[in-house]
């Protein structure tokens, strides 16, 4: 407790017998784990997502817990985040990816085969519709509105109090 001048390094040691290597990644070789060669977020869609221990839990300088508590909480945070994320992705990632794929395929199909042909057809027909609409407006609607306007302009109202 108090002001620590050096940073504590958190490490987790596990026996090889108790750790299952069936996840597909060889954690014994840190070179393969650190640089997998594939950026899974190339467009930085989740750059605002902060899931590091220091980003979530922080103690001000004036209030520090015991060093062992801080180290254990950091280790438990990292382990629970890792295990829970893997667990949730096993059960949710595949169904949600399937649903998102169906949704985007449906939207793409609708956009490509229905919406864009309709818009292009409307844009091709619009010049002739514009000509017809202008003729209808000039021949029917403009004289009708002029007549109605002249008729109503000759009406005058007088209010008298009796």
From Swiss-Prot:
Record keywords, A-Z: Cell membrane, Cytoplasm, Golgi apparatus, Membrane, Nucleus, Phosphoprotein
Post-translational modification: Phosphorylated on serine and tyrosine residues. CAV1 promotes phosphorylation on Ser-23 which then targets the complex to the plasma membrane, lipid rafts and caveolae. Phosphorylation on Ser-36 appears to modulate mitosis in endothelial cells. Phosphorylation on both Tyr-19 and Tyr-27 is required for insulin-induced 'Ser-727' phosphorylation of STAT3 and its activation. Phosphorylation on Tyr-19 is required for insulin-induced phosphorylation of MAPK1 and DNA binding of STAT3. Tyrosine phosphorylation is induced by both EGF and insulin (By. similarity).
Gene Ontology BP, a term: endoplasmic reticulum organization
Chain ranges inside the bilayer that never cross it: 87-107
GO molecular function terms noted in the UniProt entry: D1 dopamine receptor binding; molecular adaptor activity; protein kinase binding
Gene Ontology CC terms, in alphabetical order: caveola; cytoplasmic vesicle; focal adhesion; Golgi membrane; nucleus; perinuclear region of cytoplasm; plasma membrane raft; sarcolemma
Subcellular location: Nucleus; Cytoplasm; Golgi apparatus membrane; Cell membrane
Phosphotyrosine PTM positions: 19, 27
InterPro entries, sorted: Caveolin (IPR001612), Caveolin_CS (IPR018361)
Function: May act as a scaffolding protein within caveolar membranes. Interacts directly with G-protein alpha subunits and can functionally regulate their activity. Acts as an accessory protein in conjunction with CAV1 in targeting to lipid rafts and driving caveolae formation. The Ser-36 phosphorylated form has a role in modulating mitosis in endothelial cells. Positive regulator of cellular mitogenesis of the MAPK signaling pathway. Required for the insulin-stimulated nuclear translocation and activation of MAPK1 and STAT3, and the subsequent regulation of cell cycle progression.
Family: Belongs to the caveolin family.
Assembly and oligomerization: Monomer or homodimer. Interacts with CAV1; the interaction forms a stable heterooligomeric complex that is required for targeting to lipid rafts and for caveolae formation. Tyrosine phosphorylated forms do not form heterooligomers with the Tyr-19-phosphorylated form existing as a monomer or dimer, and the Tyr-27-form as a monomer only. Interacts (tyrosine phosphorylated form) with the SH2 domain-containing proteins, RASA1, NCK1 and SRC. Interacts (tyrosine phosphorylated form) with INSR, the interaction (Tyr-27-phosphorylated form) is increased on insulin stimulation.
This protein's name: Caveolin-2
The organism of origin for this protein: Otolemur garnettii (Small-eared galago)
């Amino acid at each position: 407790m108090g002001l620590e001048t050096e940073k504590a390094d958190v490490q987790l040691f596990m026996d090889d017998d108790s750790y299952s290597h069936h996840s597909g990644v060889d954690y014994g070789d840190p070179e393969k784990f650190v640089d997998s060669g594939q950026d899974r977020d190339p467009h930085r869609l989740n750059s605002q997502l902060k899931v590091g221990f220091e980003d979530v839990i922080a103690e001000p300088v004036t209030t520090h817990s015991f060093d062992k508590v801080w180290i254990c909480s950091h280790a438990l945070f990292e382990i629970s985040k890792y295990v829970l994320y893997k667990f949730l992705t096993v059960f949710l990632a595949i169904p949600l990816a399937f649903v998102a794929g169906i949704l985007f395929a449906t939207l793409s199909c609708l956009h490509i085969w229905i919406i864009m042909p309709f818009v292009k057809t409307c844009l091709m027909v619009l010049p002739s519709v514009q000509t017809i609409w202008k003729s209808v407006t000039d021949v029917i609607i403009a004289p009708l509105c002029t007549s109605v306007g002249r008729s109503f302009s000759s009406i005058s109202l007088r209010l008298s109090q009796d």
